[in-house]
């Protein structure tokens, strides 16, 4: 095998192991988390919201909720183990 082919196969292998942004989260439709430490951000998709959660440097993001109608993302330091869950329409809660 030529050097170029080996490099190409290696890059394809590394790319395939990354997975989807939401794979690291468990989701609950219609659940909202009461959180003290949070940020509200605009996001066009759940995946974009997950990326914002992963990239945040101000606190450790343990959960996020996505409001599809408003295209709003709320990233939070708390999760269901440390906070209260309330029922809410048109929202999906994602937790690590």
UniProtKB/Swiss-Prot annotation:
Start and end residues of each PAN domain: 20-96
Gene3D superfamilies the record matches: Hepatocyte Growth Factor (3.50.4.10)
Location(s), subcellular: Secreted
Keyword Disulfide bond: yes
GO CC annotation: extracellular region
Record has Methyltransferase as a keyword: no
Tissues where this protein is expressed: Expressed in liver.
Keywords, in A-Z order: Disulfide bond, Secreted, Signal
Cited InterPro entries: Pan_app (IPR003609), Plasminogen-rel (IPR016351)
Classification via PROSITE patterns: PAN (PS50948)
Record-annotated disulphide pairs: 49-73, 53-61
Major location (coarse): secreted
Function description: May bind non-covalently to lysine binding sites present in the kringle structures of plasminogen. This may interfere with the binding of fibrin or alpha-2-antiplasmin to plasminogen and may result in the localization of activity at sites necessary for extracellular matrix destruction.
Protein name as annotated: Plasminogen-like protein A
Organism, scientific name: Homo sapiens
Gene: PLGLA
């Amino acid at each position: 095998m030529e050097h170029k082919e080996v490099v190409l196969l290696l890059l394809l292998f590394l790319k395939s192991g990354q997975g989807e942004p939401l794979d690291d989260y468990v989701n609950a439709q219609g659940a909202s988390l009461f959180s003290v430490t949070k940020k509200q951000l605009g996001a066009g998709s759940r995946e974009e919201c997950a990326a914002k959660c992963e990239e945040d440097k101000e606190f450790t993001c343990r959960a996020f909720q996505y409001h599809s109608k408003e295209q709003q993302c709320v990233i939070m330091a708390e999760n269901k183990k440390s906070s209260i869950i309330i029922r809410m329409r048109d929202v999906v809660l994602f937790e690590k």
